[in-house]
Every structure is written in C-alpha cells, then in structure tokens.
C-alpha cells in the first residue's frame, strides 16, 4: 500500500514538471563554453528530445463524405488537411488518390509523370508543410515582431522557424528575406525520412526528396515558397 502511494505521488510530481530550461539561453551558452562545447549544444539536445519524445504528430481520420476520406494532422498549430479518392483506390490507381488543401483548393500529391521533364520541385509545397506539421515543436505564441528584434525561439527547430516565416510573410518579399537571414544559422534538426512516409493508412504518397528531413531547405526555396494557409 505504501509503495502504491509513493508511485502516485511521484507520478503527480513528474506530471506537473514544466518542459524547458530554467535558465535563459545566454546562460546555457556560457555553460557550453566553460565545458568546451559548441554554444548551441543545449538547444540541439533539447530540441531533439522535444521532437522525438512523443514521436511527432500523426495523421488522423476525420470523416467520409461523397466518395472521399478526409484526414488531418493532430497538431493544433499547424493543421494540414488531406483527403483520398476512394474510387481511385478501388481501381488500384492509388498514385493520384491523395490530395491536400492549399489556400482553399485541393491539389493532388504523389503524381507519377509518364513523360520526361523537370518535375523535381512540383511537390515541394506539400513536403515542406508536411515536415513541419509532423514535427512536435510547440509553435504557439510565435510573434513575428519579436523575432525581428532578435528574440529567437530556442524551442523551435530550423524547419519550423522557416515554416512560421513562410506562413506569416509574402513570397519573394523583403520582409521574408530578412527573417530567413535571421534564422540562417539556427541549428537544423534531422527528421528520419520514414516519418514522412509512415502514416496510419496504406498507399500514402511516397516522399522522393530528403529536403527538410535530412537536408535543410535552402534560403532561396523558402523565399519563393507559397504557404498553404489562407
């Protein structure tokens, strides 16, 4: 009986514990220098823990309506909506069955092109946003004005910072370019490529590019990226 009480008490104590450092970031940098480590060592370790402690967000079923299955990602701050055509799946033509919502319109993802051509960047918009939607970084309270005066968010990985910039600024704008330069030296966190492909349903679109997962998006690509949010 005593053992059970101690277990409950310890569980409540851990549940109330806040995630995050109790010292400001500059203090952690000073600590890093004192033990001959890189100044971003704490941010790197902490971000990795935040990203993979809960294995990120997942794709969840919402409803079935008029021949489509509707799904959405579980993250509240970056919610992506996707659907798949049940008629195409019945015809075993699952390659073009998935669509994602971009600025109120449905766009097809996972198209297989039969004629030769340069299709390398055709799906960049989806995989850019999909990477951020899956990441478990807490994207609440991100203020673009505070970011402009140098208040960097230590608890966001580089991909999520780039995503917030794309979401809150216009493509090819001077404002976006300036903010991307601020985030240029932020530490990039690798996300395993299987996270892009492994979802709760079979026959999901195949991620063909490691960009955003094992290789960071370039400044040029982020500058030109169209946001899916209205």
UniProtKB/Swiss-Prot annotation:
InterPro entries recorded for this chain?
Lenti_VIF_2
Instruction: Return the GO cellular component terms, semicolon-separated.
Output: host cell cytoplasm; virion component
Which subcellular locations apply to this protein?
A: Host cytoplasm; Virion
Q: Which UniProt keywords apply?
A: Host cytoplasm, Virion
Question: Looking at the keywords, is Repeat present?
Answer: no
Q: Does the keyword Nucleotide-binding apply?
A: no
Could you say which protein family the record assigns here? Answer: Belongs to the ovine/caprine lentivirus group Vif protein family.
Protein name stated in the entry: Virion infectivity factor
